[in-house]
Amino acid sequence: MVKTQIKEKKKDEKVTIPLPGKIKTVLAFLVVLAFAAYGFYIRHLTAGKYFSDPDTFYHFEIYKLVLKEGLPRYYPMADAPFGSLIGEPLGLYILPAIFYKIISIFGYNELEAFLLWPPFVGFLSVIGVYLLGRKVLNEWAGMWGAIILSVLTANFSRTFSGNARGDGPFMMLFTFSAVLMLYYLTEENKNKKIIWGTLFVLLAGISTAAWNGSPFGLMVLLGFASFQTIILFIFGKINELREFIKEYYPAYLGILAISYLLTIPGIGKIGGFVRFAFEVFLGLVFLAIVMLYGGKYLNYSDKKHRFAVVAVIVIAGFAGAYIYVGPKLFTLMGGAYQSTQVYETVQELAKTDWGDVKVYYGVEKPNGIVFFLGLVGAMIVTARYLYKLFKDGRRPHEELFAITFYVMSIYLLWTAARFLFLASYAIALMSGVFAGYVLETVEKMKESIPIKAALGGVIAIMLLLIPLTHGPLLAQSAKSMRTTEIETSGWEDALKWLRENTPEYSTATSWWDYGYWIESSLLGQRRASADGGHARDRDHILALFLARDGNISEVDFESWELNYFLVYLNDWAKFNAISYLGGAITRREYNGDESGRGAVTTLLPLPRYGEKYVNLYAKVIVDVSNSSVKVTVGDRECDPLMVTFTPSGKTIKGTGTCSDGNAFPYVLHLTPTIGVLAYYKVATANFIKLAFGVPASTIPGFSDKLFSNFEPVYESGNVIVYRFTPFGIYKIEENINGTWKQVYNLTPGKHELKLYISAFGRDIENATLYIYAINNEKIIEKIKIAEISHMDYLNEYPIAVNVTLPNATSYRFVLVQKGPIGVLLDAPKVNGEIRSPTNILREGESGEIELKVGVDKDYTADLYLRATFIYLVRKSGKDNEDYDAAFEPQMDVFFITKIGENIQLKEGENTVKVRAELPEGVISSYKDELQRKYGDKLIIRGIRVEPVFIAEKEYLMLEVSASAPHH
């Protein structure tokens, strides 16, 4: 009785932390706050005029839409002229919007708050790792894990100002939810347990709305539940298993419920994965039921039999899941590292190699020190877990969760470079565990306090070398990122020119990397045909145009309603990827085989210095003297296949070999200011013409034709803006005294002219050709000079006309033909339901379509449903994975059906409603036809069903100045 009273008394007594322990906790937390603030400072050093990360320009625009509209569904600037439904979870933007609403009280504007948001996420992440570390091991583990995270390059890479992607907020929220989960599972006070559990479920559920990669969090939590369930059962801890199931399973179900509910308004976007996770969870529930109640029928007498039961059920479950889901079962988060030709060329989606790990987890230099510290820490946690399991008989939640978190993070780290950041939390945590374990060991030593203090001090100083040496280097790097490529290369001026000198509904494109810059309200504020997250099927078509020459490179850009094409000279550095995606080179030539052999350099610029053209990085020197050209590559002398001189047009043929007998399959183009060494397969690429002004082509006259369709209108730094027209005139000849002579201007009076037309990627059909007489920018007369019933864009011919011209300052040649007009301003609706503008109807579906369209002037238009197929045809290699495979991009565009006619569109915004039906089989039959034609050589990249307005449209072909009459 006395013993019982004593026990009850002890039970009622509050456990207090000794004063030194409290001091250590307070001091550790203050240190963590200091380093979190230091980490925030470093991460905010990158804040400048623009964002360092191109994708963040897009995220900024959606963030502004959230502030304006609440829950926007549509982004009008992408995939011109159609726009795009927002595919990212709105939670990614709601979080910084809430942050802005709070700090705007202190005078911060939208942009300033957005620049502060990623460093703030980094600040909170440091605190989160501290709390998680102290829960997993001890105060030291949390503190040192936080210190390491504050200056870790891997974590900095996604939490610096100007990089506002979703993985940062997600990992921050997930880390805090993990802390709450561990407190929930280990708390004995019922009321506190309810509070911890509620917060855990809410925060874990909300975290899934921050990033489309948030299934990682659900899988970590599910993996932890699975391992704990199985291990407790195998070790015969049935009572503990019952308690764990009672506590954890309802919580996980609540997380799934919140995650799914957030997908309904678009705040989250992982509904499909939530359903999959629920199905897997049901499998785990079934396994748990068998464990708890199967003892009546199965042999649970020892660990071997219990393990056998689990093994059989798990194997059967995987087999069933594979039958149900298919091969995708083993591609967790596979969307982040899909194996397509485009993704092969995106650096962050490439497979992680050891060099990446050394850089992102290095201290002072690429050495991977933090990665190794984390590995040792993981071993310590594993050893502690096994000890507790076998010796103490406890159910160690903290260690098992940490191991699960670490293992799954490392797994993803090696799948794609983009996950180097994601793994930083687990690796920093385990690095802190290593430090915490060492310091805890010192504390428990039976030595005198001075000796322990000295040892602890030495260890602390050694650990402090990580932030003390790496922090300043990271800060220096951050400062250099403040000024972006936009400001130093000509992009800023070019895009501002575009915004200030083109109509509001104009569209523009470049290589896809720069699409978000074109769209940004900070820069171009114009619709882009392709960018880093939309219209990825078009990437191949852009590459085809840039990397190829002649008829095959003629793309129907008019179907995109393209107005301006921006060429960036520095894209020579990306030209291997462009050439590969455009079908000019093979996979081996692009990036080498598994041993790196066979890779080529497709383009190499050689700036001119005196009489030499030099690229010191590549050790290439070109000496030009009179009619001879000497090319030195390292210690070899090489003779290109051909040398061309611009503007003289002179050429010198060579052997294509080097002095050591190796092949040198390159063509050298020399201009007055720069030389270009080009791999023979891309030696006449359109990019070389447009970027460097080299009129090289395998097709006589093609360069002249190209420049009639692409007219340079602005240049700044390394960026050239071209105005695109699908129909141009590249040469005018006049019959002067019985002889046809090329003329460059016209005079008032009678003329007999021959017009050489370039139709780029699109036929001329039922068109009328006019000359507009212009006087002081005003049209004073329109003169009809010809009608063209049909002209194939692959087989143009000159048009002979007779015309009498009035007095004017210039004469404008204009082709009037039906073509696509207008841009969508809002998401289209079918029967009141929002639809993708590029997949507006399904086969056999009908309904009322509602469109909001903007036009730059009044039109009478017809409305069509149009199909666009973008696909690749393998033209070499045994299969699609062959290193010798090359893929020819194709784009087929055809009208399906007219769904509206004589629609009156007024300048500005218009709302149009029509009844429409997509005939059954029209898409599938064309797809089947392609598959029959190309077999296993076919890869379909995109199938679109688009609403397109067609109206009489004026195409400016050429404008020439007027001169005095001939004498």
Swiss-Prot record:
DXD motif 1, short sequence motif: residues: 53-55
Side Cytoplasmic, residues: 1-21, 134-135, 187-193, 237-247, 291-306, 382-396, 440-453
Protein biosynthesis among keywords: no
Keywords, ordered alphabetically: Cell membrane, Glycosyltransferase, Magnesium, Manganese, Membrane, Metal-binding, Transferase, Transmembrane, Transmembrane helix
Domain of life (superkingdom): Archaea
Catalytic activity, EC: 2.4.99.21
UniProt motif (DK motif) ranges: 571-578
Any one Gene Ontology cellular component term annotated for this protein: plasma membrane
Pathway assignment: Protein modification; protein glycosylation
Membrane topology per record: Multi-pass membrane protein
Residues of the site described as Important for catalytic activity: R158
Family membership noted in the UniProt record: Belongs to the STT3 family.
Protein name, per record: Dolichyl-phosphooligosaccharide-protein glycotransferase 1
Organism per entry: Pyrococcus furiosus (strain ATCC 43587 / DSM 3638 / JCM 8422 / Vc1)
